[in-house]
């Protein structure tokens, strides 16, 4: 075993010594804090805490007038790890992770839509009420479906994950269709009043594809010409070779006629 490096435990002592020697112009603000809360000196490392996945469900209990909230605890399976990874922090998982994975697996093109990731105060979620899918000040996206599905699971009695997913997905399709219709009608109204829009994304993509095809066609023609030139240099010019073969055949015919006449 190598020697223990206890330099981090002596940070305060070194700072005090440097201050008394006049090397520090100003006392560090953390000096008194490290005196009150010194770093641990225990060299035995404990295994990290195993986080549990707690799920809230409303279930109808026989004999009860109202559905009761039931908390289900799912223990995480402890997988054998290498000795070097034994003390690494355990990954924290939430119930939304599986719902989010399932939705974006079924709707991969939702990830291609632009999204706003900047929050004003970091507590924007407190203003949202997921009893309905569409929220004020938030664009409709896949995260709305995930939060709506989670709300249904936590607040509707005897709700299953598949049923909540179908309800949230149906509402999402209806609102997304409404947005597309509103966008199309707004564009038609603007064009009727004289507005001129540029090319759409589909048209831009087709133009880029056509340019790439024309560039490839020119490259293919050039490669074909170079291939023909290399073949001609190896076998000779096709026209000259054909003329030589024809001349040789005529000479052979003449020789045969002379031999027959003799």
Curated annotation (Swiss-Prot):
Sorted alphabetically, the keyword list is: Mitochondrion, Ribonucleoprotein, Ribosomal protein
Q: Which InterPro entries match?
A: Ribosomal_mS23_fun
Question: Where does this protein reside within or beyond the cell?
Answer: Mitochondrion
Principal subcellular localization: mitochondrion
Example GO CC term: the record gives: mitochondrial small ribosomal subunit
Region of interest (Disordered), residue spans: 242-262
Q: Which family does it belong to?
A: Belongs to the mitochondrion-specific ribosomal protein mS23 family.
Complex formation: Component of the mitochondrial small ribosomal subunit.
Q: What is the name of this protein?
A: Small ribosomal subunit protein mS23
Species lineage: Eukaryota, Fungi, Dikarya, Ascomycota, Pezizomycotina
């Amino acid at each position: 075993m190598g020697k223990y490096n206890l330099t981090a435990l002596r940070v305060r002592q070194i700072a005090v010594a440097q201050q008394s020697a006049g090397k520090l112009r100003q006392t560090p603000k953390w000096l008194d804090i490290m005196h009150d809360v010194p770093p641990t000196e225990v060299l035995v490392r404990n295994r990290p805490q195993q986080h549990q996945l707690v799920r809230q469900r409303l279930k109808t209990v026989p004999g009860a007038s109202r559905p009761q909230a039931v908390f289900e605890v799912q223990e995480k399976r402890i997988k054998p790890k290498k000795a070097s990874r034994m003390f690494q922090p355990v990954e924290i998982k939430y119930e939304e992770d599986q719902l989010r994975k399932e939705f974006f697996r079924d709707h991969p093109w939702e990830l291609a839509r632009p999204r706003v990731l900047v929050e004003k105060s970091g507590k924007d979620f407190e203003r949202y009420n997921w009893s309905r899918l569409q929220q004020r000040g938030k664009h409709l996206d896949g995260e709305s479906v995930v939060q709506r599905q989670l709300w249904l699971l936590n607040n509707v009695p005897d709700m299953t994950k598949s049923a909540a997913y179908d309800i949230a997905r149906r509402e999402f399709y209806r609102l997304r269709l409404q947005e597309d219709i509103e966008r199309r009608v707004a564009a038609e109204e603007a064009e009727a009043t004289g507005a001129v829009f540029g090319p759409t994304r589909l048209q831009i993509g087709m133009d880029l594809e056509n340019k790439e095809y024309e560039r490839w066609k020119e490259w293919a023609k050039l490669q074909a010409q170079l291939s023909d030139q290399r073949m001609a240099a190896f076998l000779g010019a096709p026209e000259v070779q054909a003329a030589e073969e024809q001349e040789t055949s005529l000479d052979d015919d003449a020789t045969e006629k002379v031999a027959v006449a003799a």
